Amino acid sequence: MSHENERLVIIRHAPYSSNALREGLDVALVAAAFGQTVSLLFLGQGVLALLKEQKTGAPGQKATLPTIDMLEMYDIDQLLVPQSALDALHLQVDQLVEGATVVADAGLPELLHRHSQVMNF
């Protein structure tokens, strides 16, 4: 059952590969500022946005790690990563920012169903 005003933002793009990551984070921040419950699910290359040791992008591109770090101030504390995404990128959870939570792939359908709004970036 989905809950009203619960939004799941799915991030699929790596930092600096396009504007999709930044746009997804902006949507999450705006929704949270208006009192919606927001969870972030990082899939595929999107998991790279959660790396502690993130490199900077090309000149003129804003770093995404400061935005990730301030999500908690907006009560966005669900930073979810499927185990398969970590495995595919040969990453361990300790390489990710504090607060990232590994979820079982089997639980993803229920996670999607639980949110009234799902947005992909």
Residue ranges of model-derived segments:
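A glycine-rich helix N-cap at a beta->alpha junction
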Residues: 57-87
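Structural alpha-helical scaffold elements that stabilize or flank donor/cofactor-binding regions
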Residues: 111-112
